[in-house]
């Protein structure tokens, strides 16, 4: 019975493990290297204004066009969000017949019955095009997925900042005698009919309202920051500036004063912005009128301009060429880089089926300040499931980072195509007797800049090191005659007004790489980034900088962790209780009765009085 009980408990533990898994991921598992790259680039960018923090996004139009306008077409979205896709571009249509915002580009005939059944696909036509649309599909389907992802990642370690981008369009018709028949077909006849769609722009994102960084919050921040600037107008000496103050001072010169990623994400606990990046609504008396409530929630071009470029023309490449060649024999054209760094603009580059992104073009766009939006229908051709990552992740994961080289961050054993020194540049160190001897120490804990990007390198190697101007973030100095190992680098090794630092944005990164070309020095070059104190927690501030994170377990994760063990333990206790109370061993029962009867018969035959002699 005991062996049977053990076997049953073992079987039950496996069964419960399948019911209450430790991981409840509904999408592909993100590998550790990619996760570390995402988190470390986010951490490095914390002091940078949120509009200049790079991100990548997807256009949902490509999903809808290839699979139809239904909730099934959104099945890949959750998986993409886990793969470093932080933006969602949505084409939103104002239906002039119903006065509703909808996702389908065509109006629905008024004889369609609206039911709660999901995926009820119908063929609808408009402007000589036919679409497959679900009348029940609305922006709530998209926002529910975003809301679920935000709640699952709402910790200091996992939280990222996201963007919802609207392209506003119209389902428009000209009012005339000939259009009366159109109104009879598409205009709702029953005012009590529950037509799917949203009345206002604000309603389209209402599910995410508690997570949205709004124009109202921006105005409050600007008001507070202006008061602080006015109250602290005393002259600061350069030497007294810490890095955070230096970054704030530089970006306070921007065309629009924006808060940092640190302020929005980890102080105000806001996770996304909503932008109207294009407004192509037809001018009409039936057109949607943007309200003050919309303006309080959603960013328009008057609040934060958006510039959209397309891969099918050369306009996006012009800026990249200008910045890459912004140097001559004597110096780097810092003004060109500062003009981009201080211009508060959302720069987007969108591809298509004819000119999709390549790994080379994508890296170029990301490095020169663009946010790529994947719009080609080939990205939606394959389902994203557990163990089956998206095409974007498989082909472009390494190219979505302006910082890390492909395959990084990773140690020497797992590194692919890493730049490793071919000569022994390890430093000398003193032994216990104070004598200097050649060191053979190896510690792949420090980060160096290579031609491909950042790489984890041996801290004891002697490289050049990057010195950044405290007051001008795009101005760098590289002393070609001085090499140090990471532990020996000090701010005093940099020229006056400069300090040992690292790029914190794509433009700062490009300005440093341009300086390398202008000064004609060799890679690798040390930057102020390491994971010495805690593995895979990359921090700046020298070798003694501390990791800001502690291992945290959310309530949901804790419940999932203990549920299998708790259920198994309870079942085992119940079985033990049943065994003790209800079960009797027949052999033991018979033995007890036999000896009791034998003793009674013995005393009956040998009944004494007194003490036997």
UniProtKB/Swiss-Prot annotation:
Residues 1-17 form the signal peptide. The keyword Membrane applies. The keyword Cell inner membrane does not apply. InterPro entries: Telomere_Capping_Maintenance. May be involved in telomere capping. Residues 579-613 are cytoplasmic. The chain crosses the membrane at residues 558-578. Keywords: Glycoprotein, Membrane, Signal, Transmembrane, Transmembrane helix. This is Maintenance of telomere capping protein 6. It holds the Pfam family TIM-barrel_MTC6. It is a single-pass type I membrane protein. Belongs to the MTC6 family. Its main location: membrane. One of its GO terms (cellular component) is membrane.
């Amino acid at each position: 019975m005991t062996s049977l009980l053990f076997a049953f408990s073992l079987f039950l533990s496996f069964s419960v493990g399948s019911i209450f898994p430790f991981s409840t991921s509904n999408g592909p598992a993100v590998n550790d290297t990619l996760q570390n790259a995402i988190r470390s680039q986010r951490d490095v960018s914390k002091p940078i204004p949120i509009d200049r923090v790079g991100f990548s996004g997807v256009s949902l139009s490509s999903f809808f066009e290839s699979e139809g306008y239904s909730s099934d077409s959104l099945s890949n979205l959750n998986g993409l969000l886990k793969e470093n896709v932080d933006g969602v571009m949505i084409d939103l249509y104002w239906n002039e017949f119903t006065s509703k915002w909808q996702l389908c580009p065509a109006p629905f005939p008024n004889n369609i019955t609206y039911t709660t059944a999901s995926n009820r696909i119908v063929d609808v036509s408009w402007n000589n095009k036919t679409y497959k649309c679900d009348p029940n599909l609305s922006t709530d389907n998209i926002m529910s997925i975003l809301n679920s992802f935000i709640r699952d990642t709402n910790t200091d370690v996992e939280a990222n900042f996201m963007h919802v981008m609207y392209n506003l369009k119209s389902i428009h018709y000209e009012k005339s005698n000939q259009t009366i028949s159109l109104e009879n077909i598409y205009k709702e006849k029953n005012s009590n009919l529950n037509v799917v769609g949203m009345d206002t722009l604000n309603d389209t994102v209402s599910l995410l309202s508690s997570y949205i960084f709004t124009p109202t919050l921006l105005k409050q921040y600007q008001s507070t920051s202006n008061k602080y600037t006015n109250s602290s107008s005393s002259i600061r000496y350069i030497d007294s500036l810490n890095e955070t103050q230096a970054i704030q001072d530089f970006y306070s010169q921007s065309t629009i004063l924006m808060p940092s990623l640190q302020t929005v994400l980890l102080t105000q606990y806001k996770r996304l912005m909503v932008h109207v990046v294009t407004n192509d609504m037809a001018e009409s008396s039936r057109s949607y009128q943007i309200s003050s409530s919309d303006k309080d929630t959603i960013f328009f071009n008057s609040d934060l301009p958006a510039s959209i470029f397309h891969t099918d023309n050369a306009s996006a490449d012009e800026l990249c060429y200008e910045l890459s060649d912004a140097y001559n024999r004597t110096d780097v054209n810092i003004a060109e880089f500062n003009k981009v760094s201080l211009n508060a603009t959302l720069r987007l580059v969108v591809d298509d089926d004819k000119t999709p992104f390549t790994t080379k073009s994508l890296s170029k766009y990301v490095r020169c300040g663009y946010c790529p939006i994947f719009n080609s229908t080939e990205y939606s051709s394959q389902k994203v499931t557990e163990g089956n990552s998206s095409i974007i992740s498989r082909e472009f994961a390494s190219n979505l980072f302006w910082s890390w080289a492909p395959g990084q961050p990773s140690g020497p054993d797992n590194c692919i195509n890493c730049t490793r020194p071919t000569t022994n540049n390890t430093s000398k160190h003193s032994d216990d007797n104070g004598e200097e001897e050649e060191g053979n120490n190896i510690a792949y804990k420090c980060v160096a800049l290579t031609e491909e990007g950042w790489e984890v390198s041996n801290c004891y190697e002697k490289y050049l090191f990057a010195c950044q101007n405290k007051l001008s973030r795009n101005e760098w100095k590289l002393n070609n005659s001085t090499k140090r190992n990471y532990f020996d680098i000090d701010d005093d090794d940099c020229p006056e007004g400069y300090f040992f630092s690292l790029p914190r944005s794509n433009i700062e990164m490009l300005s440093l790489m341009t300086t390398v070309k202008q000064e004609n020095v060799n890679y690798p070059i040390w930057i102020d980034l390491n994971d010495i104190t805690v593995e895979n927690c990359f921090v700046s501030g020298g070798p003694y900088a501390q990791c800001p994170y502690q291992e945290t377990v959310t309530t949901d994760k804790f419940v999932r962790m203990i549920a299998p063990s708790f259920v198994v333990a309870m079942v085992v206790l119940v079985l033990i209780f049943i065994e003790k109370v209800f079960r009797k061993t027949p052999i033991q029962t018979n033995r007890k009765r036999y000896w009791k009867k034998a003793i009674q018969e013995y005393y009956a035959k040998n009944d004494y009085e007194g003490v036997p002699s």
